[in-house]
Amino acid sequence: MSSFRPVFRSRWLPYLLVAPQLVITVIFFIWPAGEALWYSLQSVDPFGFSSQFVGLENFVALFHDSYYLDAFWTTIKFSALVTFSGLLVSLFFAALVDYVVRGSRFYQTLMLLPYAVAPAVAAVLWIFLFNPGRGLITHFLGEFGYDWNHAQNSGQAMFLVVFASVWKQISYNFLFFFAALQSIPRSLVEAAAIDGAGPIRRFFRLSLPLIAPVSFFLLVVNLVYAFFDTFPVIDAATAGGPVQATTTLIYKIYREGFTGLDLSASAAQSVVLMFLVIILTVVQFRYVESKVRYQ
């Protein structure tokens, strides 16, 4: 089988086409990452006018800081909850809508609505519903004797930010899962049904293996979302409290750099977070993707 190779009239045209993306990558990714790495090795004054090379002292101080270690483990727990809860809930709804025959369009539209809501607005929405004094959900919980106050209870605060973050991401995951389920040939599903496989067995033995590549893609995307894009939710809902119970690494970087004006510590934390995400992504690509098999 012969391979097709595009031929350009000018040898500079391919480089010209790639140039805009390269410029964007350098300006918005490589340059900031390089500056963060440089500042992490410096002792910088609060206004950034003077600096002194200190080597790895910022990293040593970082891992001797109990508050940073708490934020590190909070990030791991928070990211795991957001990633796996979001994937499971989205897959469940996608499977239900795929199974529904009548009113499918209505449910699809309903599931996509949260994606149009900004993260900070989503957090404020759920704060109103979980307001300890006037919230509709807290009033309902109070009828069963459960007191809710996420401003004082660290477990409830964590639940609130996880819940709001998952709700915001459901639409994105649903869109990909539903499209993947719709792409499965109906003939395969009908053949499995004729062989006596029920809906649940068809899902686990047929549909789930066939959408494994999409599941892997969403696993990586949701992990990055939990690490970085949940900052507005945490800032609007709990501001990292109570007692730093919901302070993740990305929120601690913001607080150290923009509130505390400790640019060196903030840069060192950024570098650690960057390498952590890179390591997790590489592990997923090497070990999780290798498990993707069709049955």
From Swiss-Prot:
Gene3D superfamilies: MetI-like (1.10.3720.10). The chain crosses the membrane at residues 12-32, 81-101, 110-130, 158-178, 208-228, 263-283. InterPro entries: MetI-like, MetI-like_sf, UgpAE/MalFG_permease. Pfam families: BPD_transp_1. GO terms for biological process: transmembrane transport. Belongs to the binding-protein-dependent transport system permease family. UgpAE subfamily. Part of the ABC transporter complex UgpBAEC involved in sn-glycerol-3-phosphate (G3P) import. Probably responsible for the translocation of the substrate across the membrane. This is sn-glycerol-3-phosphate transport system permease protein UgpA. It comes from Salmonella choleraesuis (strain SC-B67). The lineage of its organism: Bacteria, Pseudomonadati, Pseudomonadota, Gammaproteobacteria, Enterobacterales.
